[in-house]
């Protein structure tokens, strides 16, 4: 309807979102480390759900851009306080599994987003799709405020909360002094670069190069998000299971699954077999979602009680600045640059140029981070 270019689509889903997401993430995490985390989440959920619905009234690129900025500001206050609450309920040996279960909510959201969004777009248009996806979140925010209790900080580990939250500079200095965190945060950022970049343009790849309608594609991608949820859970579960004997598994699990992911995703980009490619997205979704929970769990294990929301925000700042900020934009830019030569095939070759190198780069940093995990955990606040 608006005739947006790949670069504009990349900006909407990537850089414009990321710059506000990361800018508001840290102050909202600071608020969560000092205030009631449940209320921070409820207010944030109301904002991003409302702005998602408002997107349905956009008349041009600028309107969509402003709505996406509103969504970004709201979402910035969601995960860090939620991660901190989960880490207070579950101890170090259970934490990755618990965070993985929480993180499957992302995949459930993708499931309903693709499933409802694809079919609603086909029959009623994209404007109605935004309204249907956005409005239920407001009701959920009210339920969260009324029905969910705020857990005591340090509850699972019987740690004493002294009530004072360190300053951002202190938390950042603490984390960056740990070599394991330096490398895992870079690995996560590049991982997200691949995930957001490829994920944002995968629907375009199928719609342009395969004979498939948006409703059917939405159903397939929704189902693949279920596999992503399985991968998220298994990443956390395996890390906790294997990490009891050797904490380096909290980095080896993301490293190994990332490497296994690569040949399968290359097959998706290269094949002309539509349904075989769609089925392969189940495998890639499962493998590439295994990274998040182990990295969140190990990050929380490296810091004190009132650093947890902030540590999540710092990790998400790096992850989203690199991943969401540049992933979709770079792939969209490369696609536009080679479009005069490759035409509608340009998105295929843009993915083939960018994704393999980035995937290998990410796995390398996971392996390096694993070398320092045991020593850094010994230095964690007791």
What kind of feature is each model-predicted range?
Residues 3, 36, 57-63, 74, ...:
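Helix-breaking motifs and short loop linkers at transmembrane-helix boundaries and internal kinks
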Residues 102-146, 150:
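Helix-loop-helix hairpin linking two adjacent transmembrane segments in secondary transporters
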